[in-house]
A protein has these predicted regions:
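Conserved phosphate- and dinucleotide-binding cores of soluble alpha/beta proteins
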Residues: 13, 74-231
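Absolute protein N-terminus
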Residues: 1-2, 231
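N-terminal active-site beta-alpha-beta segment that forms phosphate/nucleotide-binding
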Residues: 2-112, 119
Length: 231
């Protein structure tokens, strides 16, 4: 297990450092290939990060942004990750970026999943993926015990996006699979709080990936997971 841990005294210091880390990678991608692609998570944790990113001096017209996962709810629902991204990240300088949402409430879910797979399998590998983590060890929408979890965690799978039903959280989800999330140049885990740090240490000690799906990502060496943590 190759894991790089960066810890900060305050969440705002973490947000600034992680934003700088991501911008450096996106700039390098644009310089090398003319475009960059970033996958971000929703939830409460990345709110400050999104604000930092939105203000960064970057040519966002050359950046694609997508989500690691999405709840199957309308865009105006308070649990919508896309709504959060549009409200906090796709502002100021980042307004120019191209956003790829994972859910449209007007479409049939199965048809939408098929369409997303075609789209994501045509996209290049990510330049950075920013994951979060729940206290149950889930990341993206890879929840312990969820219907569809083994297939979504299969690293040999060609499936990029799958529909998953958590047993312990509301709403069906569209999630990028583990195999697609790991097609990235940089893999970052963004976590806050002492409880989550304790869980990380437990997972690093050898808890199984089906018990704590985040463990699958922490176990990767290429790319190694970069953990950004603050209390």
């Amino acid at each position: 297990m190759s894991l790089l841990l960066r810890d900060f005294e305050r969440a705002d210091a973490l947000d600034a450092a992680l934003s700088e880390r991501l911008i450096d990678g996106l700039v390098a991608a644009i310089d090398a290939r003319g475009e960059a692609i970033l996958a971000v998570s929703g939830g409460r944790t990345p709110a400050g990060l999104f604000k930092c990113l939105s203000e960064a001096p970057l040519d966002f017209s050359k950046v694609m942004i997508t989500l690691t996962d999405e709840r199957c709810v309308p865009l105006d629902h308070p649990d919508s990750n896309a709504q959060m991204v549009e409200r906090l990240l796709l502002q100021r300088n980042a307004k120019q970026s191209r956003f790829i949402p994972l859910y449209d409430s007007a479409m049939d879910r199965a048809a939408q999943c098929q369409s997303l797979n075609l789209q994501f399998n045509r996209l290049p590998i990510f330049d950075a993926v920013v994951l979060g983590m729940g206290l149950d060890g889930h990341t993206a929408s890879l929840f312990p015990g969820a219907t569809g979890l083994p297939a979504a965690m299969d690293l040999s799978s060609d499936t990029a996006v799958t529909l998953i039903q958590p047993l312990t959280a509301p709403h069906a989800r569209m999630t990028l699979t583990a195999a697609r999330l790991l097609k990235t140049r940089a893999l970052i885990l963004h976590v806050t709080g002492d409880e989550k740090l304790s869980l990380l240490n437990e997972v690093r000690a050898g808890a199984g990936a089906m018990q704590y799906p985040v463990g699958l990502f922490l176990a990767q060496n290429a790319p190694a997971t970069e953990v950004f943590w603050a209390p």
